[in-house]
From Swiss-Prot:
This is UPF0210 protein lhv_0606. It holds the Pfam family DUF711. Belongs to the UPF0210 family. Homodimer. It comes from Lactobacillus helveticus (strain DPC 4571).
């Protein structure tokens, strides 16, 4: 990088809220499998606390040495449904508690991998883990869970879609805020550093470092310099900015991996917003030319942003992965919150936006009396977008117990707050209750 670019990067950190959103260490737990659940959990605790013992210390040192803010230090593990399947426990709440205890000991912010992959069907461990989710996630503060219900190669497991609607509903009855720790995927990726969907894939190395970047404020500031210019210029400006942001992510990842003696995995090219003013994906879209997010043209502007971020990021880093695109979580983005409060953005428009960006209906609050079948319908719609378009999509929806449209639910910190949004009241119950599996699309047959 030239001196001018280095100075620009320093300015991004000091003035434009550029940071590393997360350094996530992925850890395989296959060598912790045991038919005795107590022994398995002790092995898990020992491996986590040994493998990641220096993670927080190294991240803090990088932060102070290079002046680059690192917001979260996280861990992802092999899906627990696979690790716990060998034991004879009736439920896996104790595994979540072991993960929580390890995270507390290490001082990490979150730990992901209380997960199951059921896109084509269940094995015994999947059933036990999913049934344990409401209790496990409500009793822990740092544990995150995910379930993959569909893929382009397998289609959509509608039995799992039906069950996950009920799981979300059951969890919200215990503690609505805990729903932010649960995400339901199609085409889940194995190297995702972001929560709540991170897990350590079966094809990954024993340990790996993955980095998630941020930087919506940086992109917005860059676009302020090209007001009124053509869309080509907008795209080029975003690409150049994404290059610098990603370069910093790779640098931090390499330094951390070397210090921890762990392979460097990927940089996730996702623009991750926070509730802070000036750190919003919605504000980027408005800078491109929309009066408000949700206006006609929103999906096109988001597609432009997403594509330009990827093109710039790929040039800056030899290994990219994860979700890689723009995140549009309602509660974590001040511009999204404002658009919902003013009635400019609804669930249907959000769903359309998810067809061209990372993830899906994310951190969306709905009325507490929303039926489980309606939540299942939302999950099925998002899964269909992912399966047909060969991309990752997800649902992280929060039924706000005791609240109605227009009220708010507060998650605190970087998770912000969400206005409760109206949901179409027509029932998909008969569709959801059919069960079975939606077949894989015709274009999935690539061989």
């Amino acid at each position: 990088m030239e001196t001018k670019q280095i100075l620009e990067t320093i300015q991004m950190i000091s003035e434009e809220k550029l940071d590393i959103r997360t350094i996530t260490m992925g850890i395989s737990l296959f060598d912790c499998i045991d038919s005795d659940g107590v022994k398995a959990r002790q092995k898990i605790y020992d491996k986590l606390t040994t493998s990641a013992k220096d993670l927080v210390k190294v991240a803090d040192r990088i932060e102070s040495e290079y002046g680059i803010p690192i917001v979260n230090k996280r861990i992802s593990v092999t899906p627990i449904s696979m690790i716990a399947a060998a034991c004879h426990d009736d439920n896996y709440v104790a595994y979540a508690q072991t993960m929580e205890k390890a995270a507390e000991t290490l001082g990490v912010d979150l730990i992901g991998g209380f997960s199951a992959l059921v896109q084509k069907g269940y094995q015994s461990g999947d059933r036990k883990l999913i049934a344990s989710m409401p209790e496990a996630l409500s009793e822990t503060q740092r544990v995150c869970g995910s379930v993959n219900v569909g893929s382009t190669r397998a289609g959509i497991n509608m039995d799992a879609v039906k069950q996950m609607g009920q799981v979300v509903k059951d969890l919200s009855e215990i503690d609505p805020v805990s729903c932010m720790s649960l995400v339901i995927f199609s085409n889940a990726v194995e190297d995702n550093p972001f929560m709540a969907g991170a897990f350590h894939g079966v094809g990954e190395a024993d340990k790996v470092i993955n980095v998630g970047i941020s930087g919506p404020g940086v992109v917005k500031r860059a676009l302020e310099q090209v007001k009124g210019e053509s869309i080509d210029t907008v795209s080029e400006t975003i690409k150049k900015t994404a290059f610098k942001v990603t370069r910093m992510g790779q640098f931090v990842g390499n330094v951390a991996a070397k210090a921890l003696n762990v392979p460097f995995g990927i940089v996730d090219l996702s623009l991750a917003p926070t509730p802070s003013q000036g750190d919003s994906v919605a504000e980027i879209l408005e800078e491109i030319g929309l009066e408000s997010v949700g206006a006609p043209g929103t999906t096109a502007a988001l597609a432009l942003l997403n594509d330009a971020v990827k093109k710039g990021g790929v040039m800056a880093c030899e290994h990219v992965g994860g979700l890689s695109g723009a995140f549009i979580p309602v509660s974590e983005d001040s511009g999204m919150i404002k658009a919902v409060e003013h009635g400019n953005l609804n669930l249907e428009k959000l769903e359309a936006m998810t067809a061209v960006c990372s993830v899906g209906l994310d951190m969306v609050a709905v009325p507490g009396d929303t039926p489980a079948e309606t939540i299942s319908g939302m999950i099925a719609d998002e899964a269909a977008i992912g399966v047909i378009n060969n991309k990752t999509t997800a649902v992280r929806v929060i039924p706000a117990k005791g609240k109605q449209v227009g009220e708010q639910i507060d998650f605190g910190g970087i998770f912000g707050y969400a206005p409760v949004m109206p949901v179409n009241t027509n029932s998909p119950a008969k569709f959801v209750q059919r069960g079975g599996r939606i077949p894989a699309p015709i274009h999935s047959f690539k061989n």
